[in-house]
Amino acid sequence: MSDPVFFPFAGPISLGEVAALAGAALPAGLDGTLAVAGAAPLESAGPDDLAYMDNAKYAEALGRTRARACLVSPRFAARVPEGTAALVTPQPYRGFAQVLARLFPSAARPGSLFGATGVSPGSFVHPEARLEPGVVVDPGVVIGPGAEIGSGTVLAAGAVVGPGTRIGRGCAIGPGASLLHALVGNRVIVHGGARIGQDGFGFAMGAGGHLKVPQVGRVIIQDDVEIGANTTIDRGASRDTIVGEGTKIDNLVQIAHNVVIGRHCVIVAQVGISGSTTLEDYVVLGGQVGVVGHLRIGMGAQIAGSSNINKDVPPGARWGGTPAKPVREWFREMTTLKRLAARERGPEDTDG
């Protein structure tokens, strides 16, 4: 549940405004000035709350909800109970997100831990750093010489911005994050503990020992990227590591040197991408996917969680497994193995 201690409430919102934000249609005869004062799941929503539903698994909960209004896709609209206004929209979840951002704006991105404005006297900002008006700098932040920070950007406690690093406007850098050797666009969110721009893992290996290869590239992060907590993005070896516009990266992801990630990709937790691999636009990697280096994953490809990629993936493909292959082929192999195992199982095979 939302707790006003953590997420201050911005005030009630009328159903008319909800519909406008969510791209939904108000039912005929519904008073659009009626308001909701919160948001909650179907099963716990009360008469002042907004809920949403776009998954058949929750059809039963929809039929019992007590919410004042529910954002719902057309296929489920008839199941909304009396007493709950059905706000029909093709994308209920997306609409719900937009309403939540209006009700609880501080939850949309990391902010100052002190609710502060301006530059805290407990921070260290090098005299040669350049900060535009409206930058918020918490205590414990370190900003190196030649760094540039755009207006409206918030640096939470303990964040580190290295020499020469540039961060655009309207960004949010979470507590304890570090950004070195990086060029960051506008409206970028970096969650706490993320590490951007450290050494790539490069060694010239040999019998006489492993010689470290200096990493002299940068990290370039384009507009509207979000990077999860404790994710690490290595700077390039001799070219840049790039994260494209609108890409969303979960927590605990490792992105190696020289990786190029296209626009609007989604990378789920615990993914590891080896060096010099390219993801084209709109690629989705499920949790714990491992990608070998020097590969190309084509535009719009989707990789199932826990898969391992050891060769190029064509555009639009859906792959899974270890090693990964087209999903239909993977499913056929799994079904065949299951049949063979069942046929060969003896009476002593009783575990599980």
UniProtKB/Swiss-Prot annotation:
Cellular component annotations (GO), alphabetically ordered: membrane
Reactions mediated catalytically: a UDP-3-O-[(3R)-3-hydroxyacyl]-alpha-D-glucosamine + a (3R)-hydroxyacyl-[ACP] = a UDP-2-N,3-O-bis[(3R)-3-hydroxyacyl]-alpha-D-glucosamine + holo-[ACP] + H(+)
Enzyme Commission no: 2.3.1.191
Any one GO molecular function term: N-acyltransferase activity
Active-site annotation: H257
UniProt similarity note: Belongs to the transferase hexapeptide repeat family. LpxD subfamily.
Name by which UniProt lists this protein: UDP-3-O-acylglucosamine N-acyltransferase
Gene: lpxD
